[in-house]
Amino acid sequence: MVPVEGVAPSELTDTYHQGRSGGRIHMATDILAMRGTPVLAAAPGRIIKLANGGAGGITIYVADASGRYVQYYAHLMGYAPNVKEGLQVREGDVIGFVGTTGNAPPNTPHLHFQVMRSDANYWNGTPIDVRAFITKPGRMRN
């Protein structure tokens, strides 16, 4: 599922392969949306880390049930009221809101979304280009 309310898979662009400063590759999907748009859990899992600072700004890490994959949500404006570390989330749960924290341009609100194979460290796994796997539009769970 697209992790931003109201965004269809056809609206996603290839930001995964874009170059960044220092010769690095982005290796994530940026999803543009209005500031404050709900950010949704793309898949079920457990929130393992909430962080605020650095390049990602306000961030959420969600591990899947197997512990093999981690979803990373960055540049959030803030967390949903119920969000805390250890919380089990289901696909479509509101977990935060699109923003511009961290190194995001202040006039370009977006969600920086990344899925990683959880290698030695949850925050530094092997990134996966998830666009081929995102087949459902972002819709809040009732």
Locations of the language-model features?
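Surface-exposed, glycine-biased beta-strand/turn segments
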Residues: 1-58, 91, 100, 128-142
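Alpha-helical interaction segments
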Residues: 2, 6, 62-64, 123
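Feature marks short, surface-exposed loop/turn motifs that line or immediately flank catalytic pockets
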Residues: 20, 79-80, 117-119
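Zn2+-dependent peptidoglycan hydrolase active-site motif and core
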Residues: 42-85, 104, 108-114
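Conserved, short, structured surface segments that act as functional micro-motifs
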Residues: 61, 69, 87-142
